[in-house]
Amino acid sequence: ISAADPSSAPAAWSKAGLLVVALCFAINMVDGMDVVIMSYIAPALGRDWGVAPDAMGVVFSAGLAGMAIGGIFIAPLADRLGRRKIILAALALMSVGMMASGFVASLWQLVAARVLVGCGIGTVLAAMAALAAEAAPQGRRDMAVGIVQAGYPLAAVFTGLIAAHMLPIWGWQKLLLVAGAATVIMLPLTWMILPDRRVTADDQPAGPAFGALMAADLRARTLLLWVAVFTGLMVLYFIVSWIPKLSIEAGLSETNGIYAGALYNFGAFVGTMSMSMLSTRFPLGRIIPAFLLSSGVAMMIFGSVSMSVPLTLLVAFVIGVTLQGGYNGMWPLAAAIYPEACRATGIGWAVAIGRGGAVIGPLMGGYLMASGTSLTLLFAAYCVPLVLCAAAAFLAGRLVSAQQQA
């Protein structure tokens, strides 16, 4: 069944469908909390254990590696065993990993725990996008998947505020346990709310799951999606990882640099919600490039124009709106690319491919900054993958539109 086939979608919103989308939004908030909390506790953990920044980078990379493993090896099982079972299993992995993180006694124990958490997150990201698309009416699928994605940046804002106030009081171990408890709470809610849709032989992909993505009718769209998510996450993770430091380089104080990071994440939430609403009126293949190219303009202004503190913070907010708002449109686009029988597999592979860009982006940025590259040249360099991302999304969107009109 095609993602665009009206026969595979409910005719209108149902209470059950709205509840499923709301639950997926909440789960994605927990995902966001479990990911970004490490960046907030890293300085305290480093002081307590005497961990050097490069060793701390191993912890961050462990989470990304886990996401790739979950996306490639676990998420495709959702197409064979059903969304509900795999989401519950992934939440269980995340719960074990997060709770274990609060009791670890060494860096390598923490690395192992973060791999578990990453496996769960990579799985959930793919399965939830597929589930939200299938719970929504045909004309609201892109909006539903986009709304679910908005949970992640919203969680980043709240997690930062909570960490800023409670880290000095609780310490980093208790913060990890609180995040783990929030993940555990999602298990019974998911068990009660998500429908237990049985997977029939007709629903399952014929032949190897990966082979379905490379079938003649999907190959071009799959490769374009991979280019888009890889190059998009190169830029996105560069900004997310370095925006406080980049803001300081642009002339802000350390405190205002932290505010710039918070405003970026709030902008990401606003942008993702805006993209979701716009997707009901305009094709994603046009909205995503418009957002991403606008973010390139904002990035160049941020890196090359001397501005007052309020204006600099405003531009950081605009980058969040346009960059992450545009990038998060990739997941409803991915849900539209693949038929139901291989949707979780397709999105899972896209999640995994994107993690490669997520690793390379911050590393390249750190190297360029260490070599003394100016902010203007630095942002110009990242506009190259940004334009590639926009072009790939545009072409993939055209192929989806052509299929829907066929």
Where do the language-model regions lie?
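Extracytoplasmic gate region of multi-pass secondary transporters
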Residues: 38-39, 217-272
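C-terminal membrane-cytosol helix-exit motif in multi-pass small-molecule transporters
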Residues: 181-200, 389-397
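Cytoplasmic helix-loop-helix junction between adjacent transmembrane helices
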Residues: 113-150
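Paired small-residue
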Residues: 93, 97, 108-116, 310-318
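Conserved MFS/SLC helix-loop-helix module at the cytosolic interface between two early adjacent transmembrane helices
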Residues: 69-107
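Helix-loop-helix hairpin linking two adjacent transmembrane segments in secondary transporters
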Residues: 147-192
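Cytosolic juxtamembrane N-terminal segment immediately preceding the first transmembrane helix
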Residues: 1-33
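Helix-breaking motifs and short loop linkers at transmembrane-helix boundaries and internal kinks
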Residues: 50, 82, 103-109, 137, ...
